Design a protein with these regions (language model features):
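Short, surface-exposed beta-strand/loop micro-motifs that present aromatic residues
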Residues: 237-244
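Chitinase-like catalytic core of GlcNAc-active glycosidases
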Residues: 2-233, 247-249, 253, 258, ...
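C-terminal helical cap(s) of enzyme catalytic domains, especially alpha/beta-barrels
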Residues: 201, 261-283
Length: 283
């Protein structure tokens, strides 16, 4: 099966090739627009449209520990968010309703700008992500899935790639995990053996939702970071990773994929990985 190439794209303006989605190699399947929560400029809208015409997708992406993060008029202060989304700290039902409203606001933004979906970066505790109240995050995700199904949009979760962070994965209900199109794991400093240990070692991904582990691995994207040059080699190591358990993963990606633009040709590291990950079939 085809393995996807993915990236978190930051510093997006759509003005220069290095800050445009259209500057990416054609074989990049989808990107998460890192820290983009709507309000697209004319240049961004044009760039997005051309990128989609090439067959690629782009989704919104941000961290949201709390209900309302980044979409609350007046800012991210807790009392401001609670007031706007109708949360009464003494009434759990108001959290569930607010989680639905927050999901619908994200859907509205995706529809308004013709963005292809949402990548939920799960690494903060708060009023939305809480092991004491898992129903909040699960209601949020189920609402997104239900609405995205109407328009063919994609839903992605991204979670840090260390075993201690799997507590966030554990909050997600099995049906929610099954409903995800992809899970992007932030496995920034892991080579082959580290990835194997993360997925199938003691306390790894396979220890959670074990009944659906095969399905999860098939849609799991392993990633490295281009933010720190010293860690970039992990990306090239991950391009020929094959899980030792014998189940193939979904693909690979990079945090700040746009940092690989400089080169001749441009995106040299990404292009090499695209070829290595899906080698040409010789008949």
């Amino acid at each position: 099966p085809h393995k996807v190439m993915f990236g978190w794209f930051g510093n997006w303006t759509g003005v220069t090739m290095s800050s445009s989605l259209c500057g990416l190699p054609d074989s990049v399947d989808f990107v998460s627009l890192w820290l983009c929560w709507g309000n697209l400029t004319a240049e961004q809208q044009t760039d997005l449209r051309k990128f989609q015409e090439k067959g690629s997708k782009a989704v919104l992406c941000w961290r949201a520990g709390d209900i309302g993060d980044n979409l609350t008029p007046g800012g991210n202060a807790t009392d401001v968010k609670n007031a706007f989304w109708g949360i009464d700290p003494n009434d759990e039902d108001t959290y569930i309703e607010a989680a639905k409203k927050y999901a619908l606001a994200i859907v509205d933004t995706c529809n308004k700008y013709n963005v292809d979906g949402f990548d939920y970066d799960i690494e903060d505790n708060g009023t939305l992500i809480s092991s004491e109240h898992p129903e909040r995050a699960n209601t949020f995700m189920r609402t997104l899935r239900e609405e995205f199904n109407k328009t063919g949009k994609i839903l992605v979760a991204d979670i840090p790639g260390g075993k201690s962070w799997l507590r966030f994965y554990d909050i997600l209900a099995e049906d929610v995990v099954q409903s995800l199109d992809y899970i992007a794991w932030q496995t920034y400093e892991l080579g082959h053996s580290g990835l194997d240990d993360f997925f199938t070692g003691y306390g790894g991904v396979s220890s959670y939702h074990p009944e659906i582990f095969e399905e999860v691995l098939k849609k799991s994207i392993v990633t490295a970071t281009f933010e720190r040059a010293i860690d970039k080699h992990y990306f090239s190591e991950q391009q020929d990773y094959h899980p030792s358990c014998g189940i193939e993963h979904g693909g690979m990606g990079a945090y700040h994929i746009e940092y690989d633009y400089p080169g001749n040709p441009d995106y040299p590291t990404v292009r090499a990985a695209i070829s290595a990950q899906n080698p040409p079939i010789n008949n």
